Regions:
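Extracellular structured ligand-interaction cores
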Residues: 37, 85-89, 96-98, 106, ...
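Short, hydrophobic/amphipathic alpha-helical packing segments
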Residues: 66-71, 84-87, 178, 286, ...
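Glycine-rich, histidine-containing beta strand-loop boundary motifs that form or position
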Residues: 42-44, 55, 94, 102-105, ...
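Short acidic-glycine loop/turn motifs at beta-strand connectors
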Residues: 92-97, 260-262, 569-570, 579
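Catalytic and substrate-binding clefts that recognize carbohydrates or anionic sugar/phosphate headgroups
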Residues: 1-158, 168-170, 174, 181-186, ...
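Aromatic- and carboxylate-enriched substrate-binding clefts and catalytic-loop regions
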Residues: 190-496, 531-532
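A residue-level signal for conserved active-site and pocket-lining positions in enzyme catalytic cores
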Residues: 90, 147, 184, 224, ...
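Catalytic core of carbohydrate-active enzymes
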Residues: 38, 63, 78, 376, ...
Length: 650
C-alpha cells in the first residue's frame, strides 16, 4: 500500500508517474514537524536495517552515518563524503516495522541514519514543501517493487551497450581513438564501444567537432562502425560564451539560459571557459537543447554520455571578485604570510554553495532559485536528450548515461558511478551501490573499471573487470595523466582477453535479466537479505549480490588474495570460467566456504535448481552466435531467455 502526504507547495519533479491521491492526517510511522523546515524522526530498534539512497557512500545497510541528497561534483569517494553525484531519496526500513519512504524534494535533503543518535533516523530539509510517499509491504523487496511501479519503467539501452567499452580522458585525435580500437581488435579482445571525452570537441564546445582532428567526422564514424566500434561522445552541461557559436547565440536570443536575479544570463567557468547553463527545467529550453544532439546523430552517432551536470562549476565572476576583495583586504601591502585560509578561499571557488543561489530557472513563468531545485538539473539534461531521441529517430534506442541524476531520470538513461579512484576499496563500493541504485530504478549502471583517478595496477584491473563482467555498463575509463590502463597495455594480454570474453559469453543471460527487470519494474541486483528473508546471517552479507533469479556474484576485491570467503544461504553450484575456455562446476553445501579464484578466472554461483545460458566468445555483441548457446548449472533446470532485435524501442 502506498500513501502520499503533501506538505506546503511542492515543486513538481515528475519523479512519480502514477496518480496517487493525497492522504489525510499523518503517516503511521515516525514524527513529523514542519516548523523551521521539514523533519521526519523515527526510533529504530537495534536490529533495524535501512536500505536505499541509490548512489551513496558506505554500505548497503545505511545505518551509522549521515548522507545528503545534494548532487555534487565530488571526485574523492572516501568514507567521509556525505554526498556524491546523485539524489535518490528512497529508503526502506526493515525490522520491527517494515516500510519505505520516498521524499520527493528537489533541494538539499539530509538523512541522519543513526549518526547523531544511534537509535534515530531523522530526515530534514530547509523547506516544508514536498511530497512524502509511505510504502507498506511484507518485505523490503515487495516495497521496492511497489515503488518501482509508480516511478515508471527503467531506461532500455541498445543491445550493443552490453558489450565492453574503452575510454580515456586524453584521447584527442582520430588516431588516438583508432589506436584504442585497433589495440583491442589486433589482440582479439572483444569490444563494442570507444568513448570520446571532451577533447574531440572544438574548444570544448557542445555539439561541435574539432575539424582539424576530424576533417570528415561522418566518414570516421563509419570507419569505426566497420570495425564493429560505436563511438560514444560526451556532452557537458555548460555552453561556451562565444560570439559566432550558434548554440550560444540561439540560447541568448531565445532566453534559454539560466538567469541571474537581475535577468542577465548567469555565467560560470567550466571546461570551455565562461559558459551559460541551459535552463533544462524550462520545457522549451529543454526541447531546444535536446534537439542539438541531432547534429551528432546525423553523423552516425548512436550513444552519448552527459557529464558535469550537477552542474559543476570551476568558479563564477562573482566568486572571483569576492576572492580578489578578500586578498586586497587581508594580504595586500602586509608583511605577514597568507596562511592556510587563502588556500581554502581559492579551493572554495569551485562548486561554491553561494554560487548555486545566484541563478534562476524559468518554470511555467515562475522564477525558481536554482538551489531549491538543484538536484533536478542532471535529470532534466538527460531528459532533454531522451525526449529528443524519440523525435529525431522514432523507434530507435540510443545509449545514454549521465553523471548526475534524480529519481525519474532512470526513465531516460543510466548513470555511471563517477570519478572513482584506482583503489581496491572502490571495487567494493561499486558492488554495494548496485542494489541501492536498482531500488531507485537505475538499472543501466557501472563504474570506471580499473579506476578513473590515480595509477592502477594490473591485478586491480583484472579483479575489477571480473566484477564489471556482470554490470550492465562495462567500461574501462581513466584520467589524463594516469597510467594507461587499456587491456592491451599489460603483460599476459591473454588474461584480459579471457576475462572480457566471459562478458560476451554471458550476454545472453545478462541481457535477458536486464530486460526482465526493466519490463517488470524489478531489480537486477539484490542484497541476499531480499530473497533469504528468514536467514539472519544473510542480512550481514554486503559483499555478495544476487543477480537475476539464477546466480549470486562474489568478486575478489583484496590485493594479493588467492580467493575469498563466501556465505551460501543455500546449496549452490560454484562456477569458474577458466582461462583455457572451460568452465568448472562444483556443488557446495549451504554455509561458509573459502573459494580459490585466480586472477584470470571469473567466478559466479548458480542457485540450487537453476541454470543459465552461456554462448561462445564473440568480438562484438552482434557477433554472438545463438547456435552456440548452452546451459550450465543444475541438470534438468530450465531457463526462460528473453531476446529481441536490440535496436527497436519497446
Amino acid at each position: 500500500m502506498i500513501q502520499k502526504y503533501t506538505y506546503g507547495t511542492p515543486f513538481e519533479t515528475d519523479a512519480i508517474v502514477t496518480s496517487i491521491p493525497t492522504s489525510e492526517g499523518t503517516p503511521a510511522y515516525g514524527t513529523i514537524s514542519t516548523e523551521n523546515g521539514f523533519s521526519f524522526a523515527y526510533d529504530m530498534d537495534d536490529n533495524d536495517v535501512v536500505y536505499g539512497l541509490g548512489e551513496s557512500n558506505r554500505g548497503i545497510n545505511k545505518r551509522g552515518y549521515v548522507y545528503e541528497s545534494n548532487c555534487s561534483d565530488q571526485p574523492n569517494h572516501t568514507e567521509d563524503k556525505i554526498s556524491l553525484y546523485g539524489a535518490h531519496n528512497f529508503i526502506v526500513i526493515s525490522g520491527k516495522q517494515t516500510f519505505g519512504l520516498f521524499v520527493d524534494y528537489p533541494g538539499k535533503l539530509k538523512f541522519d541514519i543513526g549518526y547523531t543518535l544511534s537509535s534515530q533516523l531523522k530526515i530534514t530539509c530547509e523547506d516544508a514543501d514536498l511530497y512524502l510517499y509511505v510504502i507498506e509491504g511484507e518485505t523490503p523487496y515487495d516495497i521496492v517493487k511497489q515503488f518501482r511501479k509508480i516511478i515508471g519503467r527503467s531506461y532500455i539501452p541498445p543491445k550493443f551497450a552490453f558489450g565492453f567499452g574503452q575510454s580515456r580522458w586524453g584521447y584527442t585525435t582520430a588516431d588516438d581513438f583508432r589506436k584504442a580500437a585497433d589495440g583491442y581488435r589486433e589482440n582479439n579482445i572483444p569490444i563494442d564501444m570507444v568513448y570520446m571525452d571532451i577533447d574531440y570537441m572544438e574548444d570544448y564546445k557542445d555539439f561541435t567537432i574539432n575539424q582539424e582532428n576530424f576533417p570528415d567526422f561522418e566518414a570516421y564514424v563509419n570507419e569505426m562502425k566497420e570495425k564493429g566500434i560505436h563511438l560514444v561522445p560526451i556532452i557537458d552541461a555548460g555552453v561556451k560564451v562565444e560570439a559566432g557559436y550558434d548554440v550560444y547565440e540561439e540560447g541568448v536570443e531565445k532566453n534559454y539560459f539560466c538567469k541571474r536575479e537581475d535577468g542577465s544570463d548567469f555565467v560560470s567557468a567550466v571546461w570551455p571557459g565562461w559558459t551559460h547553463f541551459p535552463d533544462v527545467l524550462n520545457a522549451d529550453a529543454r526541447a531546444w537543447f535536446g534537439q542539438k544532439y541531432e547534429r551528432l546523430i546525423s553523423k552516425g552517432i548512436d550513444g552519448f554520455w552527459n557529464d558535469m551536470n550537477e552542474p559543476a562549476m570551476f568558479c563564477t565572476p562573482e566568486g572571483v571578485a569576492e576572492l580578489k576583495e578578500y586578498i586586497k583586504d587581508n594580504f595586500m601591502d602586509k608583511e605577514e604570510a597568507p596562511g592556510f585560509t587563502l588556500g581554502d578561499k581559492v579551493n572554495a571557488l569551485a562548486n561554491n554553495p553561494e554560487d548555486y543561489k545566484r541563478f534562476y530557472h524559468n518554470v511555467n513563468g515562475q522564477k525558481i532559485r536554482h538551489d531549491k531545485v538543484h538536484n533536478l538539473f542532471g535529470y532534466n539534461m538527460t531528459r532533454a536528450a531522451g525526449e529528443a531521441f524519440e523525435k529525431i529517430a522514432p523507434g530507435k534506442r540510443f545509449l545514454m548515461f549521465s553523471r548526475s541524476s534524480y529519481v525519474g531520470m532512470h526513465r531516460y538513461g543510466g548513470i555511471w558511478m563517477g570519478d572513482n579512484k584506482s583503489w581496491w576499496s572502490h571495487i567494493l563500493l561499486n558492488l554495494k551501490m548496485l542494489p541501492s541504485l536498482n531500488m531507485c530504478g537505475f538499472l543501466y549502471t557501472g563504474a570506471d573499471l580499473g579506476g578513473f583517478g590515480a595509477d592502477t595496477t594490473r591485478d586491480l584491473v583484472l579483479r575489477w573487470l571480473a566484477l564489471g563482467v556482470f554490470t550492465p555498463l562495462m567500461r574501462n575509463h581513466s584520467a589524463l595523466g594516469t597510467r594507461e590502463q587499456e587491456a592491451y597495455q599489460f603483460e599476459n594480454i591473454e588474461d584480459f582477453r579471457h576475462v572480457i570474453g566471459v562478458r560476451y559469453r554471458l550476454v545472453p543471460y545478462l541481457y535477458s535479466e536486464y530486460m526482465k527487470a526493466a519490463l517488470n519494474d524489478d531489480m537486477m541486483f539484490r542484497p541476499l537479505a531480499f530473497d533469504y528473508t528468514d536467514d539472519a546471517f544473510a542480512t550481514q552479507v554486503e559483499d555478495q549480490l544476487l543477480l537475476g533469479n539464477e546466480i549470486m556474484i562474489a568478486p575478489v576485491y583484496t590485493q594479493n588474495a588467492k580467493g575469498r570467503y563466501v556465505y551460501l544461504p543455500e546449496e549452490m553450484m560454484f562456477v569458474k570460467f577458466l582461462p583455457d575456455g572451460t568452465i568448472s562446476q562444483e556443488i557446495l553445501e549451504k554455509g561458509h566456504h573459502y573459494v580459490e579464484v585466480a586472477l584470470n578466472e571469473v567466478p559466479l554461483f548458480i542457485r540450487k535448481g537453476k541454470a543459465i545460458p552461456v554462448a561462445d566468445v564473440a568480438q562484438t555483441v552482434k557477433d554472438i552466435n545463438p547456435a552456440t548457446i548452452r546451459m550450465i548449472g543444475y541438470e534438468g533446470a530450465e531457463y526462460d531467455r528473453y531476446d529481441d532485435d536490440g535496436v527497436s524501442t519497446l
